[in-house]
């Protein structure tokens, strides 16, 4: 049979849900997927059908959602978030994934998005399509039985706690307001639409034979959602902690460490989380897992580089940047901003598009990528300036998976 790539009709969605159920271990059903569909633009999905007419089968699918991503400088960019990408096991190694990505990238570029983003199910797939890992997921597990806070850690006095134990569904408005403040100031922050708040709070309820009920710790400038692990009754897993201030972060952790019926508290956070340094024994906050988080593809190099902010301390400098399959540009950085224009001048620094995606939020250093020969320049001073200019003074974090 002949395969065809096109936009899906309503008749295709049952087949797409079947392919999702077979492809994604965390797929929880059509009802949740239908809610996420509200974030997909009119031309934001493609399918590959095997055959024609009513009997044709969906053997490939991909879509993008209309998202808003915070980047350094407290700038928020329209972002195309790729998701729901799958190829049937019966049709692998036929170029379907490449064809779907190429078509979606064409539509994303035509719609004017400066960047595209995704969460990768496998680490070796999306680099060849121009995506680079731009944030890092970092799991810390704390043995709370022996944890003690430094005397100079915030909130160490004898006054009453500023944190309350609450039920998540009863405090949605406060969570939304805190999250909105957080996501605008943190590179990697994403606007969370109402349908995703609906889903998050629905997941806080206990599921028969599944997850236990979630509880919340609420501070005026932060919150934490946690539940006891399904199989380990001495482990509390924090599913989300958002703090707008250092005081709120410490206050929430004081409350979590106070869960006396637990032995351990785990959280998936970011590599610069100050939690270990709040404790007198940093070893009690162990790194138990680490993985790439958000991946970025720079769709429009000048627009993306001119949109974000840069470190003021670097001073003004200029270079010529060549991005494989992306163009060659005169890049001038100064006073916290960049000017990026096409040029025919000889390149002084070269990289693939995925490398620029990894650099963009500031989580990864140009010098580190140069040491792996992923970024190439003969000018060591330029490399140091790029390190300093692209660095974010606010730690890069991962908002949520999509």
UniProtKB/Swiss-Prot annotation:
Catalytic activity: L-lysyl-[protein] + acetyl-CoA = N(6)-acetyl-L-lysyl-[protein] + CoA + H(+)
InterPro entries in the record: Acetyltransf_17, Acetyltransferase_Eis, Acyl_CoA_acyltransferase, Eis_dom, GNAT_dom, NAcTrfase_Eis, SCP2_sterol-bd_dom_sf
Keywords, sorted A to Z: Acyltransferase, Host cytoplasmic vesicle, Secreted, Transferase
EC number(s) on file: 2.3.1.-
Any Gene Ontology CC annotation: bacterial extracellular vesicle
CDD domains according to UniProt: NAT_SF
Keyword Secreted belongs to the record: yes
Top-rank EC class of the record's enzyme: transferase
PROSITE patterns: GNAT
Location within or outside the cell: Secreted; Host cytoplasmic vesicle, Host phagosome; Extracellular vesicle, Bacterial extracellular vesicle; Host extracellular space
Single GO MF descriptor: protein-lysine-acetyltransferase activity
N-acetyltransferase domain sequence ranges: 3-154
Any one Gene Ontology BP term: aminoglycoside antibiotic catabolic process
Active site (record annotation): 126 (proton donor), 402 (proton acceptor)
Residues reported in the UniProt entry to bind acetyl-CoA: 85-87, 93-98, 121-122
Oligomer status and interactors: Homohexamer; trimer of dimers.
Family assignment from sequence similarity: Belongs to the acetyltransferase Eis family.
Described function: Effector that is released into the host cell and affects host immune responses. Acts as an acetyltransferase that acetylates lysine residues of host proteins.
Name listed for the protein in its UniProt record: N-acetyltransferase Eis
Organism per entry: Mycobacterium bovis (strain ATCC BAA-935 / AF2122/97)
Higher taxonomy: Bacteria, Bacillati, Actinomycetota, Actinomycetes, Mycobacteriales
Name of the encoding gene: eis
